[in-house]
Curated annotation (Swiss-Prot):
Name of this protein: Putative large ribosomal subunit protein uL23c
GO CC field: chloroplast; cytosolic large ribosomal subunit
Any one GO MF annotation of this record: rRNA binding
Functional summary from the UniProt entry: Binds to 23S rRNA.
UniProt organism field: Spinacia oleracea (Spinach)
Subunit (UniProt): Part of the 50S ribosomal subunit.
Recorded family membership: Belongs to the universal ribosomal protein uL23 family.
Pfam families from the UniProt entry: Ribosomal_L23
Keywords: Chloroplast, Plastid, Ribonucleoprotein, Ribosomal protein, RNA-binding, rRNA-binding
Residues covered by region (Coded by first part of gene): 1-46
Main location: plastid
Amino acid sequence: MDGIKYAVFTDKSIQLLGKKQYTSNVESRSTRTEIKHWVELWNSYEMNSHRLPGKGRRMGPIMGHTMHYRRMIITLQSSYSIPPLRKKRT
């Protein structure tokens, strides 16, 4: 489970918490099958993931990009819960 970066707390993800759906970012090079194996440890019954587009950053004349992440949404069974994931430092 080292590939899980941090939990995501946006307006949409907070609404999904009421439906027992947890949102977190993982490393972009992780595959769906690897993520599926991590999720099986939490006794979930559904997992969805997608890649987030990187944003452009400019430092003078040079154009760069921010890090790319993959976001996963885990839906748990009603009787299970997961421990809190570590938060992103700001």
